[in-house]
Design a protein with these regions (language model features):
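A structured binding-face within diverse protein domains that lines the active/interaction site
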Residues: 1-142
């Protein structure tokens, strides 16, 4: 599924930030919010597919490509989502793009353009959909 989607069904997943959880000692994890220092939205490299759902309905699914972490993200997790620089988005979406060239786009985004900060554990529940989920509880890491 992923190989075909990588070749033929690439997309951008637009966001203004994302969460990642840092493992602590034991089973606890600390949530972090990561965003561009500029605060502007960005595009993740994504792939999509249509699957047959129940009763012959079609179910659209997508996944965000990941890569090894940059210096900032390595402090939090062992991988990170692929954030495409603005000048490479069209190339990612180009149906004629060469597969090896596309693989070359799956690299860590520059650390110096990102910030990460600890947020409340409110984010751990999907029932909590408020600005409190992205408010810093500690100063930003950069």
């Amino acid at each position: 599924m992923f190989r075909d989607a990588f070749r033929r069904h690439r997309c951008l997943v637009v966001a203004d930030g994302f969460y990642e959880w840092k493992k602590n000692h034991g089973r606890s994890r600390t949530p972090f919010f990561i965003r561009l220092k500029s605060g502007r939205p960005f595009g993740f490299a994504g792939i999509w597919s249509l699957k047959r759902g129940e009763k012959a309905t079609r179910l659209a699914t997508c996944a965000i490509a990941t890569c090894s972490p940059n210096e900032l993200m390595a402090k939090i997790h062992n991988r990170m989502p692929v954030i495409l620089p603005a000048d490479l988005r069209d190339r990612w979406l180009d149906p004629a793009a060469d597969e090896s060239e596309l693989r070359g786009l799956l690299v860590p985004f520059p650390s110096q353009e990102l910030e990460a900060y600890e947020v409340s554990k409110l984010v751990n529940s999907p029932r909590n959909d408020s600005p409190d989920c992205v408010r810093p509880v500690m100063a930003a890491m950069d």
